[in-house]
Regions:
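Short acidic/glycine- and proline-prone juxtamembrane loop motifs at membrane-interface regions
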Residues: 37-45
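Transmembrane-helix signature of polytopic, membrane-embedded enzymes
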Residues: 4-33, 47
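Membrane-interface transmembrane helices that cradle and orient dolichyl/undecaprenyl
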Residues: 53-69, 180-189
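Short hydrophobic alpha-helices at membrane interfaces in multi-pass membrane enzymes
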Residues: 59-77, 119-123, 193-199
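Transmembrane catalytic cores of multi-pass membrane glycosyltransferases
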Residues: 84-189, 217
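Membrane-interface alpha helices of multi-pass inner-membrane proteins
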Residues: 30-34, 56, 69-84, 127-132, ...
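Short periplasmic/luminal acceptor-recognition loop of GT-C membrane glycosyltransferases, typified by
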Residues: 286-324, 345, 349-356, 382
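Membrane-proximal, lumen/periplasm-facing interface regions of secretory-pathway glyco-
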Residues: 237-288, 301, 308, 317-319, ...
Length: 386
Protein backbone atom coordinates (compact mmCIF):
# COMPACT_ATOMS: atom_id res chain seq x y z
CA UNK A 1 0.00 0.00 0.00
CA UNK A 2 2.85 2.40 0.77
CA UNK A 3 4.31 1.83 -2.70
CA UNK A 4 0.88 2.45 -4.26
CA UNK A 5 0.55 5.71 -2.31
CA UNK A 6 4.00 6.84 -3.43
CA UNK A 7 3.38 6.03 -7.10
CA UNK A 8 -0.09 7.61 -7.14
CA UNK A 9 1.06 10.80 -5.40
CA UNK A 10 4.07 11.21 -7.67
CA UNK A 11 1.87 10.73 -10.75
CA UNK A 12 -0.58 13.37 -9.52
CA UNK A 13 2.13 15.91 -8.65
CA UNK A 14 4.02 15.22 -11.88
CA UNK A 15 0.86 16.14 -13.77
CA UNK A 16 1.04 19.64 -12.28
CA UNK A 17 4.74 20.32 -11.97
CA UNK A 18 7.40 20.47 -14.68
CA UNK A 19 10.58 18.78 -13.60
CA UNK A 20 10.88 15.15 -12.63
CA UNK A 21 13.03 15.68 -9.56
CA UNK A 22 10.89 18.52 -8.23
CA UNK A 23 7.84 16.27 -8.35
CA UNK A 24 9.78 13.47 -6.68
CA UNK A 25 10.98 15.79 -3.89
CA UNK A 26 7.50 17.18 -3.23
CA UNK A 27 5.96 13.71 -3.20
CA UNK A 28 8.61 12.43 -0.80
CA UNK A 29 7.97 15.38 1.52
CA UNK A 30 4.24 14.69 1.62
CA UNK A 31 4.80 10.99 2.24
CA UNK A 32 7.13 11.77 5.13
CA UNK A 33 4.46 13.98 6.70
CA UNK A 34 2.03 11.06 6.48
CA UNK A 35 4.37 8.40 7.89
CA UNK A 36 2.81 8.38 11.37
CA UNK A 37 -0.67 7.56 10.12
CA UNK A 38 0.24 5.14 7.33
CA UNK A 39 -0.34 1.55 8.38
CA UNK A 40 -2.48 -1.55 7.83
CA UNK A 41 -5.89 0.07 8.30
CA UNK A 42 -8.98 0.71 6.11
CA UNK A 43 -8.20 4.44 5.94
CA UNK A 44 -5.23 3.76 3.67
CA UNK A 45 -7.62 3.13 0.79
CA UNK A 46 -9.19 6.53 1.42
CA UNK A 47 -5.79 8.23 1.14
CA UNK A 48 -5.02 6.37 -2.07
CA UNK A 49 -8.40 7.10 -3.66
CA UNK A 50 -8.26 10.80 -2.75
CA UNK A 51 -4.91 11.01 -4.56
CA UNK A 52 -6.32 9.14 -7.55
CA UNK A 53 -9.37 11.41 -7.54
CA UNK A 54 -7.24 14.56 -7.61
CA UNK A 55 -5.14 13.07 -10.39
CA UNK A 56 -8.15 12.22 -12.54
CA UNK A 57 -9.91 15.55 -12.04
CA UNK A 58 -6.79 17.62 -12.68
CA UNK A 59 -5.97 15.54 -15.75
CA UNK A 60 -9.49 15.93 -17.17
CA UNK A 61 -9.38 19.65 -16.48
CA UNK A 62 -6.16 19.94 -18.48
CA UNK A 63 -6.80 17.48 -21.32
CA UNK A 64 -10.58 17.77 -21.65
CA UNK A 65 -10.95 13.98 -21.81
CA UNK A 66 -14.16 13.68 -19.83
CA UNK A 67 -14.43 9.95 -20.44
CA UNK A 68 -12.11 9.41 -17.48
CA UNK A 69 -14.79 10.82 -15.19
CA UNK A 70 -16.85 7.67 -15.62
CA UNK A 71 -14.23 5.79 -13.65
CA UNK A 72 -15.40 7.67 -10.58
CA UNK A 73 -18.89 6.20 -9.88
CA UNK A 74 -17.60 2.59 -9.60
CA UNK A 75 -14.70 3.89 -7.53
CA UNK A 76 -17.11 5.56 -5.12
CA UNK A 77 -19.23 2.40 -4.91
CA UNK A 78 -16.15 0.47 -3.74
CA UNK A 79 -15.08 3.32 -1.47
CA UNK A 80 -18.41 3.59 0.35
CA UNK A 81 -18.31 -0.13 1.13
CA UNK A 82 -14.76 0.11 2.46
CA UNK A 83 -14.36 3.27 4.54
CA UNK A 84 -16.65 5.98 5.88
CA UNK A 85 -14.35 8.76 4.70
CA UNK A 86 -15.61 8.38 1.15
CA UNK A 87 -17.29 11.69 1.96
CA UNK A 88 -13.88 13.32 1.52
CA UNK A 89 -14.01 12.21 -2.08
CA UNK A 90 -17.49 13.65 -2.55
CA UNK A 91 -16.25 16.91 -1.06
CA UNK A 92 -13.32 17.06 -3.49
CA UNK A 93 -15.54 16.24 -6.45
CA UNK A 94 -18.14 18.76 -5.30
CA UNK A 95 -15.60 21.58 -5.06
CA UNK A 96 -14.38 20.84 -8.57
CA UNK A 97 -17.97 20.87 -9.82
CA UNK A 98 -18.51 24.25 -8.13
CA UNK A 99 -15.32 25.76 -9.54
CA UNK A 100 -17.09 28.00 -12.10
CA UNK A 101 -19.22 29.44 -9.29
CA UNK A 102 -16.13 29.97 -7.12
CA UNK A 103 -14.35 31.69 -9.98
CA UNK A 104 -17.32 34.01 -10.40
CA UNK A 105 -17.43 34.85 -6.69
CA UNK A 106 -13.70 35.57 -6.56
CA UNK A 107 -13.70 37.28 -9.97
CA UNK A 108 -11.10 34.88 -11.26
CA UNK A 109 -10.83 34.34 -15.01
CA UNK A 110 -9.18 31.02 -15.81
CA UNK A 111 -8.21 29.75 -19.20
CA UNK A 112 -11.09 27.79 -20.71
CA UNK A 113 -8.94 24.68 -21.07
CA UNK A 114 -8.35 24.63 -17.32
CA UNK A 115 -11.98 24.08 -16.35
CA UNK A 116 -13.96 20.90 -16.03
CA UNK A 117 -17.02 20.90 -18.29
CA UNK A 118 -19.80 21.89 -15.88
CA UNK A 119 -22.37 19.41 -17.16
CA UNK A 120 -19.94 16.49 -17.02
CA UNK A 121 -18.75 17.48 -13.54
CA UNK A 122 -22.26 17.71 -12.06
CA UNK A 123 -23.40 14.53 -13.78
CA UNK A 124 -20.38 12.70 -12.39
CA UNK A 125 -21.06 14.08 -8.92
CA UNK A 126 -24.67 12.89 -9.10
CA UNK A 127 -23.69 9.45 -10.39
CA UNK A 128 -20.96 9.09 -7.76
CA UNK A 129 -23.32 10.10 -4.96
CA UNK A 130 -25.87 7.53 -6.11
CA UNK A 131 -23.10 4.94 -6.36
CA UNK A 132 -22.31 5.40 -2.66
CA UNK A 133 -25.82 4.12 -1.90
CA UNK A 134 -24.86 0.68 -3.26
CA UNK A 135 -23.99 -0.61 0.18
CA UNK A 136 -25.75 -2.85 2.73
CA UNK A 137 -27.18 0.16 4.58
CA UNK A 138 -28.30 2.28 1.64
CA UNK A 139 -28.93 5.91 2.47
CA UNK A 140 -28.53 5.18 6.19
CA UNK A 141 -24.77 5.22 5.69
CA UNK A 142 -25.00 9.00 5.78
CA UNK A 143 -26.47 8.87 9.27
CA UNK A 144 -23.18 7.31 10.36
CA UNK A 145 -21.34 10.19 8.71
CA UNK A 146 -23.45 12.68 10.67
CA UNK A 147 -22.93 10.69 13.85
CA UNK A 148 -19.15 10.83 13.47
CA UNK A 149 -19.30 14.54 12.68
CA UNK A 150 -21.27 15.23 15.85
CA UNK A 151 -18.98 13.29 18.19
CA UNK A 152 -16.71 16.19 19.11
CA UNK A 153 -16.29 15.46 22.82
CA UNK A 154 -14.17 12.36 22.25
CA UNK A 155 -11.42 14.23 20.43
CA UNK A 156 -9.44 14.69 23.64
CA UNK A 157 -9.79 11.04 24.64
CA UNK A 158 -8.47 9.30 21.51
CA UNK A 159 -4.83 10.00 20.68
CA UNK A 160 -5.12 10.14 16.90
CA UNK A 161 -8.08 12.53 17.10
CA UNK A 162 -6.14 15.10 19.11
CA UNK A 163 -4.42 18.13 17.60
CA UNK A 164 -0.78 18.09 16.54
CA UNK A 165 1.58 18.08 19.50
CA UNK A 166 4.61 19.39 17.58
CA UNK A 167 6.73 16.77 19.28
CA UNK A 168 7.37 15.08 15.94
CA UNK A 169 9.19 16.47 12.87
CA UNK A 170 6.22 15.59 10.66
CA UNK A 171 4.10 18.21 12.42
CA UNK A 172 6.59 21.01 11.76
CA UNK A 173 6.99 19.90 8.16
CA UNK A 174 3.20 20.00 7.75
CA UNK A 175 3.23 23.66 8.80
CA UNK A 176 6.02 24.37 6.31
CA UNK A 177 3.97 22.70 3.57
CA UNK A 178 0.98 24.91 4.37
CA UNK A 179 3.17 28.02 4.34
CA UNK A 180 4.72 26.90 1.08
CA UNK A 181 1.29 26.37 -0.43
CA UNK A 182 0.16 29.83 0.70
CA UNK A 183 3.33 31.32 -0.75
CA UNK A 184 2.76 29.51 -4.05
CA UNK A 185 -0.76 30.92 -4.27
CA UNK A 186 0.46 34.44 -3.49
CA UNK A 187 3.34 34.14 -5.91
CA UNK A 188 1.01 33.55 -8.84
CA UNK A 189 -1.29 36.42 -7.79
CA UNK A 190 -4.03 34.79 -9.86
CA UNK A 191 -4.23 31.58 -7.90
CA UNK A 192 -7.31 29.47 -8.43
CA UNK A 193 -10.01 29.90 -5.74
CA UNK A 194 -10.38 26.13 -5.89
CA UNK A 195 -7.01 25.71 -4.15
CA UNK A 196 -7.90 28.28 -1.51
CA UNK A 197 -11.00 26.28 -0.54
CA UNK A 198 -9.07 23.03 -0.41
CA UNK A 199 -6.21 24.53 1.60
CA UNK A 200 -8.56 26.10 4.15
CA UNK A 201 -10.56 22.89 4.55
CA UNK A 202 -7.44 20.73 4.85
CA UNK A 203 -5.89 23.08 7.40
CA UNK A 204 -9.02 23.09 9.56
CA UNK A 205 -9.19 19.30 9.50
CA UNK A 206 -5.50 18.60 10.10
CA UNK A 207 -4.88 21.18 12.81
CA UNK A 208 -7.93 19.95 14.65
CA UNK A 209 -7.08 16.25 14.38
CA UNK A 210 -3.65 14.86 13.55
CA UNK A 211 -5.33 11.85 11.90
CA UNK A 212 -6.23 14.10 8.95
CA UNK A 213 -2.68 15.31 8.34
CA UNK A 214 -2.60 13.20 5.18
CA UNK A 215 -5.25 15.39 3.54
CA UNK A 216 -3.28 18.53 4.35
CA UNK A 217 -0.12 17.00 2.89
CA UNK A 218 -1.82 16.00 -0.37
CA UNK A 219 -3.56 19.35 -0.87
CA UNK A 220 -0.44 21.35 0.02
CA UNK A 221 1.86 19.61 -2.46
CA UNK A 222 -0.78 19.94 -5.19
CA UNK A 223 -1.06 23.68 -4.50
CA UNK A 224 2.73 24.09 -4.48
CA UNK A 225 3.06 22.09 -7.69
CA UNK A 226 0.34 24.08 -9.44
CA UNK A 227 1.85 27.37 -8.25
CA UNK A 228 5.32 26.35 -9.42
CA UNK A 229 4.09 25.69 -12.92
CA UNK A 230 4.51 28.60 -15.30
CA UNK A 231 1.68 29.28 -17.77
CA UNK A 232 2.08 27.36 -21.00
CA UNK A 233 4.84 25.14 -19.65
CA UNK A 234 5.12 21.53 -20.75
CA UNK A 235 4.28 19.73 -17.55
CA UNK A 236 4.66 16.13 -18.61
CA UNK A 237 7.79 16.52 -20.64
CA UNK A 238 9.88 13.51 -21.46
CA UNK A 239 12.15 12.22 -18.72
CA UNK A 240 15.72 11.39 -19.79
CA UNK A 241 16.61 7.71 -19.75
CA UNK A 242 19.46 8.42 -17.35
CA UNK A 243 17.03 9.92 -14.82
CA UNK A 244 14.71 6.95 -15.11
CA UNK A 245 17.56 4.53 -14.50
CA UNK A 246 18.74 6.54 -11.49
CA UNK A 247 15.25 6.58 -10.02
CA UNK A 248 14.93 2.84 -10.54
CA UNK A 249 18.23 2.25 -8.78
CA UNK A 250 17.27 4.52 -5.88
CA UNK A 251 13.85 2.90 -5.50
CA UNK A 252 15.42 -0.56 -5.51
CA UNK A 253 17.98 0.57 -2.94
CA UNK A 254 15.29 2.02 -0.68
CA UNK A 255 13.19 -1.15 -0.92
CA UNK A 256 16.16 -3.37 -0.10
CA UNK A 257 17.23 -1.11 2.75
CA UNK A 258 13.68 -1.09 4.13
CA UNK A 259 13.50 -4.88 3.97
CA UNK A 260 16.80 -5.05 5.81
CA UNK A 261 15.95 -2.40 8.39
CA UNK A 262 12.37 -3.40 9.13
CA UNK A 263 12.87 -7.11 8.60
CA UNK A 264 9.86 -7.96 6.44
CA UNK A 265 9.00 -11.32 7.95
CA UNK A 266 6.43 -12.85 10.27
CA UNK A 267 8.95 -12.94 13.10
CA UNK A 268 9.73 -9.25 12.69
CA UNK A 269 6.02 -8.42 12.55
CA UNK A 270 5.47 -10.27 15.83
CA UNK A 271 8.32 -8.34 17.44
CA UNK A 272 6.89 -5.00 16.29
CA UNK A 273 3.40 -5.99 17.44
CA UNK A 274 4.67 -7.05 20.84
CA UNK A 275 6.40 -3.69 21.22
CA UNK A 276 3.24 -1.67 20.63
CA UNK A 277 0.52 -3.98 21.96
CA UNK A 278 0.17 -6.46 24.85
CA UNK A 279 1.07 -9.55 22.84
CA UNK A 280 2.61 -11.38 25.81
CA UNK A 281 -0.45 -10.69 27.94
CA UNK A 282 -2.70 -12.01 25.18
CA UNK A 283 -0.69 -15.21 24.94
CA UNK A 284 -1.02 -15.67 28.70
CA UNK A 285 -4.80 -15.29 28.43
CA UNK A 286 -4.91 -17.83 25.61
CA UNK A 287 -2.68 -20.35 27.35
CA UNK A 288 -4.67 -20.22 30.59
CA UNK A 289 -8.03 -19.94 28.80
CA UNK A 290 -9.20 -17.03 30.89
CA UNK A 291 -12.82 -16.09 30.30
CA UNK A 292 -14.60 -12.77 29.96
CA UNK A 293 -16.32 -10.42 30.04
CA UNK A 294 -13.22 -8.39 29.17
CA UNK A 295 -12.46 -4.86 30.35
CA UNK A 296 -9.71 -3.30 28.24
CA UNK A 297 -7.82 -0.15 27.39
CA UNK A 298 -9.49 1.76 24.56
CA UNK A 299 -6.33 2.08 22.45
CA UNK A 300 -5.84 -1.68 22.62
CA UNK A 301 -9.43 -2.50 21.68
CA UNK A 302 -8.82 -3.15 18.00
CA UNK A 303 -5.79 -5.32 18.71
CA UNK A 304 -7.63 -7.38 21.33
CA UNK A 305 -10.61 -7.73 19.02
CA UNK A 306 -8.26 -9.31 16.49
CA UNK A 307 -6.17 -11.44 18.85
CA UNK A 308 -8.96 -12.56 21.20
CA UNK A 309 -12.02 -12.86 18.95
CA UNK A 310 -13.72 -15.15 21.46
CA UNK A 311 -13.69 -12.35 24.09
CA UNK A 312 -15.77 -9.32 23.06
CA UNK A 313 -13.92 -6.12 23.99
CA UNK A 314 -15.47 -3.54 26.28
CA UNK A 315 -14.48 -0.71 23.96
CA UNK A 316 -12.47 0.03 20.82
CA UNK A 317 -11.98 2.90 18.40
CA UNK A 318 -15.41 2.59 16.73
CA UNK A 319 -16.90 5.64 18.40
CA UNK A 320 -20.12 5.37 16.40
CA UNK A 321 -20.80 1.94 17.93
CA UNK A 322 -20.32 2.88 21.58
CA UNK A 323 -21.35 6.53 21.66
CA UNK A 324 -19.74 9.56 23.26
CA UNK A 325 -21.22 9.13 26.73
CA UNK A 326 -19.85 5.63 27.17
CA UNK A 327 -16.43 6.58 25.85
CA UNK A 328 -16.17 9.57 28.20
CA UNK A 329 -17.35 7.48 31.15
CA UNK A 330 -14.85 4.81 30.22
CA UNK A 331 -12.09 7.42 30.10
CA UNK A 332 -12.96 8.64 33.59
CA UNK A 333 -12.78 5.08 34.91
CA UNK A 334 -9.42 4.51 33.29
CA UNK A 335 -8.07 7.69 34.87
CA UNK A 336 -9.29 6.57 38.28
CA UNK A 337 -11.67 9.47 38.80
CA UNK A 338 -14.22 9.35 41.65
CA UNK A 339 -16.78 6.61 41.13
CA UNK A 340 -14.50 4.47 38.98
CA UNK A 341 -15.13 1.34 41.07
CA UNK A 342 -18.89 1.47 40.51
CA UNK A 343 -18.68 1.41 36.71
CA UNK A 344 -21.12 -1.22 35.33
CA UNK A 345 -18.67 -2.55 32.71
CA UNK A 346 -16.00 -2.99 35.37
CA UNK A 347 -18.51 -4.66 37.71
CA UNK A 348 -19.35 -7.26 35.04
CA UNK A 349 -15.74 -7.91 34.04
CA UNK A 350 -13.97 -11.16 34.86
CA UNK A 351 -10.81 -10.17 33.00
CA UNK A 352 -9.00 -6.82 32.73
CA UNK A 353 -6.06 -6.01 30.46
CA UNK A 354 -4.54 -2.60 31.18
CA UNK A 355 -1.30 -0.73 30.56
CA UNK A 356 0.97 -1.05 33.56
CA UNK A 357 1.31 2.72 33.97
CA UNK A 358 -2.44 3.43 33.82
CA UNK A 359 -4.07 4.88 36.93
CA UNK A 360 -6.60 2.07 37.06
CA UNK A 361 -3.79 -0.50 37.16
CA UNK A 362 -2.60 0.93 40.48
CA UNK A 363 -6.12 1.13 41.89
CA UNK A 364 -7.05 -2.43 40.95
CA UNK A 365 -4.13 -3.79 42.96
CA UNK A 366 -6.09 -2.76 46.08
CA UNK A 367 -9.49 -3.88 44.79
CA UNK A 368 -10.62 -7.02 46.61
CA UNK A 369 -12.61 -8.15 43.57
CA UNK A 370 -9.54 -8.71 41.39
CA UNK A 371 -6.07 -10.19 41.58
CA UNK A 372 -3.00 -9.87 39.37
CA UNK A 373 -2.83 -12.89 37.07
CA UNK A 374 0.01 -11.69 34.84
CA UNK A 375 2.32 -8.69 34.66
CA UNK A 376 5.18 -7.51 32.50
CA UNK A 377 6.81 -4.16 31.71
CA UNK A 378 3.95 -3.25 29.39
CA UNK A 379 0.68 -4.66 30.67
CA UNK A 380 -1.11 -6.10 33.68
CA UNK A 381 -3.78 -8.79 33.50
CA UNK A 382 -6.28 -8.84 36.36
CA UNK A 383 -8.63 -11.77 36.93
CA UNK A 384 -11.68 -11.82 39.17
CA UNK A 385 -11.18 -13.65 42.46
CA UNK A 386 -13.19 -16.84 42.73
Amino acid sequence: MRVALAVALFHAVRGLLPGFWRAAALSATALFVMTRIIGPRPGMLTILLVIVLFDILLSVRTTGRTGMLWLLPPMFALWANWHIQFVYGLFVLGVFACEPLLNSLFRYRPQARNLLPASAAWLTLLASTLATLLNPYGVKIYSTVLLYAGQTRVYNEITELRAMTFRQPQHFLAVLLVLGAAMAMGWRRNARPLWLIFLLAASLLAFRSVREIWFLAIVSVCVVADGWQSPGSDVRGSVPLRSRIMVGVWVLAVVLASCRYYGLSNDALEIQTAGAFPEAAVRFVQQHRLSGPLFNDLSWGGFLLWRLPELPVALDGRTNVYGEDRILRFSDVWKGKPGWNSDPDLARANLIITPRDAAIASLLRFDARFQVAYEDVQAVVFARRR
